[in-house]
Amino acid sequence: MSSPHIRPVIAQSYLSRVQILKEKLSPELLKGTRIGLEKESLRVSDKGGIALTNHPHTWGHPLTNTILTTDYSEALAEFITPAFSDVGDALDYLADLQSYAYQSLQKELLWATSMPCVLYGDHNIPIAEYGDSNIGKMKHVYREGLGLRYGRVMQVIAGVHFNWSLPEAFWPEFSKALGKYDSPEECRDTYYMRLVRNVLRGGWLIPYLFGASPAVCKSFFPNGVSHLPKFDDATYFEPYATSLRMGDIGYQNSKEEGLGIRADYNSVESYAQSLLRAITTPAEPWQRLGVSEEGEYRQLNANILQIENEYYSQVRPKPALKRLQSPAVALLDSGVNYIELRSLDVNAYHPLGVDEVQLRFLEAWLLMCMLSDSPSIDESENRELNENLLAVAHRGREPNIQLRRQGESVSLQEWGHQLLSQMYPICELLDKVNGGSNYEDALDEQIGKIIRPQLTPSARMLTEMEDNAESFYGFAQRLSKKHQRFLLERDISDERRAQFDQLIAKSHEDFAALSNQDSESFDQFLENYFAQTYAAVKTES
């Protein structure tokens, strides 16, 4: 079924590109879309606080395991799927992987929400360990630096990352049909960066539709004190919040903004160079902290960014990486390989942390962003985009909330309906290619949330907590236990189980081999690694 609302006028340039996909390209090219998931989960002890145990040996070694590793903390697990051509296959893999992990997890839960609980401060959050190899030390020291610069608490907020790309065979055909690019690679990079800019423009929509962090445990804040209103004695919240994770209590680079960094998304080259400049430019606040103390590294360097990953963004254009290659250098070398959408909260209501309806919608959303007109983003618009994201994160369900668009005020409902209505041609095409009505159904469900904010996950959470007289901790623990039961009861095929066993055994073998390969000191290793960034960076004109 389609929306009962009148659809606004849609740009002809966008429709003409959709028409190219319909008429000039093989449907198999859209069926070949590559989809991968990365889902973070905090391990929590049976007493309710962050787990202080090591990453389980039965999960493989976090340095070399490609499907199950750690993020910032030893307690923050990351489940990673390979790329699949269908979201259902990616979700099945994620379900099997989490079920497999649970079967060897002793007296601990995988936390069901993005926001953590019962933290007891920075000193109680163990930083992930990767062994004594140079690459392992680099990963650990980078995390030490994050904790030093921003505190450890915000680093254990969990999220879901959606990785998406079109098949390589798509780009020669699409480029030829457009008739305006010198190579398929130029077309690919141009259109992926168009996508990134439009995701940033409409980025507030993702926390509005899928945000699931309107409340937070008081232990998240120093001394349990916050400027946020109290929900109960153990919980802070905002009544119209959608995603405090994406708000100003979450992981943001506010300090970097003060240091003058802004990623430039107007081309692959400008994006890579803006990050390279930040990685090679000293920052006085970080210099004051010191790079090492008594011979031990505290951070990788004292520059604005230690490495590219430190720059927080809703979306990243990602390259195919060679071993020990800097991501920004790889982008300059080989262009964009896939898009990583990073703004999804963990879906507290689903045992996997994300569901099929969300992913079908996101597939269509990214394709719409790619095909829509996408002018460059100047500093004024960038400020608007940041303000819109924060406004929706903190008060997105507020009645009659207004956002800023091109210097003018626009209601969230009006803008949201315009954006979603533009997706119908894409959803109709994807449903035609794949059969059924999954994409249009997913879109209709999101339009329902624009019309009725009480249908959003953030509204459901607060209503449920109120109805149950439940703290955020009580809510999160109840759902964590419910999801644990679901995952432990799941049957995994013998073939899939054997595949996981093999990957985990291989990760331990690879780690052992890696430990014996280093032929240089850690100081020399870092110098050699960062030499590539200094060689590639251009001074700003």
Task: Place the predicted regions along the sequence by residue.
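Terminal catalytic/cofactor-binding subdomain
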Residues: S2-G147, M154-V160, C187-R197, R201
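Loop-rich catalytic cores of soluble enzymes, especially ATP-dependent carboxylate-amine ligases
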Residues: K22-E23, G131, I135-L148, R152, ...
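Generic recognition of stable, solvent-exposed alpha-helical segments in well-folded globular domains
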Residues: G36, D92, D96, K137, ...
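Histidine-centered divalent-metal-coordination microenvironment in nucleic-acid enzymes
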Residues: E40-L42, M154-P167, Y338-D345
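Short conserved micro-motifs at the rims of enzyme active sites and ligand-binding pockets
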Residues: L52-H55, L91, N124, F174-S175, ...
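A glycine-rich phosphate-binding loop feature that marks nucleotide/adenosyl-phosphate handling sites
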Residues: P116-V118, C217-F220, N382-V392, Y439-I450
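Substrate-recognition/cap regions that form aromatic- and gly/pro-loop-enriched pockets
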Residues: L332-D333, I339-C427, D431
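Extended, compositionally biased alpha-helical segments that mediate assembly or anchoring
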Residues: V433-S541
